[in-house]
Every structure is written in C-alpha cells, then in structure tokens.
Design a protein with these regions (language model features):
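Short C-terminal tail/terminal secondary-structure segment
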Residues: 254-272
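Conserved glycine-rich cofactor-binding loop
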Residues: 9-12
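Conserved glycine-rich Rossmann-like NAD(P)H-binding loop of the short-chain dehydrogenase/reductase
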Residues: 25-40
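Short, small/polar-rich loop/turn modules that mediate ligand/substrate recognition or access, typified
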Residues: 194, 199, 253-255
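Catalytic loop of short-chain dehydrogenase/reductase
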Residues: 89-91, 121-195
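Conserved NAD(P)H cofactor-binding loop of Rossmann-fold oxidoreductase domains
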Residues: 84-89, 263
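C-terminal helical subdomain
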Residues: 107, 174-175, 202, 222-253, ...
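Rossmann-fold cofactor-recognition segment
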Residues: 45-63
C-alpha cells in the first residue's frame, strides 16, 4: 500500500509549505476548515506532481478527526501526520484558541496513533511563545486532564488566559499556554507511542511570513528585531525543516521540541 501523509491546516502557510517537500510517491491528505483554500493548495501541489486528497475537518471535534483518520487510512498506510492547524491571538478569543490548539492536538494524536504503526511519525506544530509561559501557570497535572476531564481542563486553561489585561493580551496568554501544552503533550505522547514504533516531535516556529504571522507582526516587532537575520521566517524554510524532521532517516529525533525562531529567543542575551 502507498504511504499517506496527513497535513492539518494544509490549505496555506506552513502546512502547504511542508507539503511541497514531501516525497511525491507519498499520497497527501490536506485538511482544514476552509474548502476554498484547500482546493487552491491542491491545484498548486498537483501541478508539482503530488497526488492530493482533501477533506474538511475541525480538529477541535473528536468526531471530525476520527473521520479524517478513516478517510486517510482508506487511501493507504498512514505514515506521517503534520499537525499545523491552529489559531493565533488575533484570530479568536481564549476559549476558541485553547479548544483548537490544545484540544485539537490531543484529538489528532489520540486518534491517529490508533491507525499508525512502526515507522510512523507525528509532528505537532507548537510555537516559540511556548517558552514564554509564566512558570506559575504551567501545571502539568492540569495538562493531564485534557485526555480524560476535558471540560475541567478547558475551564482551567480559559481562566488562566483571562488573567491578562485587555482582549488581545488575554488571547495572547491563552495562545502561549495552549502551545506550552502542545510541547508537553508531544513529549508525553512520544514516550507512550514508542511501544508502537511511532515517533512524536513538536516544532516551535517563531514569527513566520504567513497570513497568521502577518496578523501578529505589529505586536511582535521586538521578536523580529531579536532574530539574527532581523526578519520573519519564510514558510518554505519552516516547511523544509518540518518535512526533514518527519523524514524516516531522522529516526532518533523524538520526544523533544525543535525551536526554529531565527535566534529570537537568545537574542536578548547577545544583542547590543
């Protein structure tokens, strides 16, 4: 059977950029909420020689993700899952951000691990903001509730986001905490799924030149200034990195977060 690569948020941005670097012998399944974006991405990738299938999916819905798994499994062996779907602070309120970013990641990992076997890989896209989470708010015992006490998890995480002053800052804190969860959860899954031979890795991009990144640029000039190149990252740079991380030749790369922020996180230590 042919190998299948599923990319959530595959209609644009980093998801689409990653798809371009996936082996053309691998069947691509792109999913997202906006069908028009998916169809445009499909045309681009097919013109480059890829076989592409589309399915709409809201990752915050466990039912949607289950149906996505069934669809992908009907096409071949699910070898790779790139989970890049998510919402940024400018796109939604704290509740929706946490539901899509955190619960969405939980849904994707828990459902796809049932359909994957030895040699499979899940790459969860987090964010460099995960490293900015206030220590007193990072409570792994709360994170653990996501799998079995989802309502309590949501209530706690939304309450944390609302601690910040101002609507944008509330969404910003919720985003930071949701991505901190993604980093932690990917590491947890890496050790749990290892028995099946499935690798799990998270990737934390800095500010990237995508539609989502542009929405946040005005609030993040200091982050751009702190990078070594004094610019935002390009989607194709992240796409190549993610596709490389997912490559089976990187079999020892697992249970860790890969920070790709152009040096912004260390800039404050060395910039003069």
């Amino acid at each position: 059977m042919a190998n299948v690569c599923v990319i959530t948020g595959g209609g644009s941005g980093m998801g689409l950029a990653t798809a371009k670097f996936i082996d053309k012998e691998t069947i691509l399944v792109l999913t997202g909420r906006t069908v028009a974006k998916l169809e445009k991405a499909k045309a681009i990738l097919e013109a480059e020689g890829h076989e592409v299938h589309l399915i709409a999916c809201d990752v915050s819905s466990r039912k949607d993700v289950h149906e996505l798994c069934l669809f992908a499994a009907s096409l071949g062996t699910i070898k790779t899952v790139i989970h890049s779907a998510g919402l940024s602070p400018a796109m939604a309120d704290p509740e929706k951000i946490i539901r899509v970013n955190a619960i969405g990641t939980k849904n994707v990992n828990m459902e796809f691990c049932k359909y994957m076997n030895d040699g499979g890989v899940i790459v969860d896209v987090a964010s460099s903001s995960a490293y900015q989470a206030p220590g007193f708010l990072v409570k792994h015992q709360i994170y653990e509730m996501a799998e079995y006490r989802e309502d309590e998890f949501m209530k706690h995480m939304v309450r944390e986001g609302n601690l910040a002053p101002g609507e944008y800052n509330k969404s910003g804190l919720a985003y930071t905490m949701s991505k901190n969860f993604v980093v932690w959860y990917a590491q947890k899954c890496a050790h749990e799924y290892a028995a099946k031979g499935i690798r799990v890795v998270s990737v934390s991009p800095g500010l990237i030149e995508t539609d989502m990144g542009e929405l946040e640029a005005e609030h993040a000039q200091n982050m751009i200034d702190a990078t070594c190149a004094h610019r935002m990252g390009k989607p194709e740079e992240l796409g190549f990195a993610i596709a490389t991380i997912a490559d089976e030749r990187n079999g020892y790369l697992c249970g860790i977060d890969v920070l790709i922020d152009g040096g912004a996180s260390t800039g404050k230590l060395f910039k003069k």
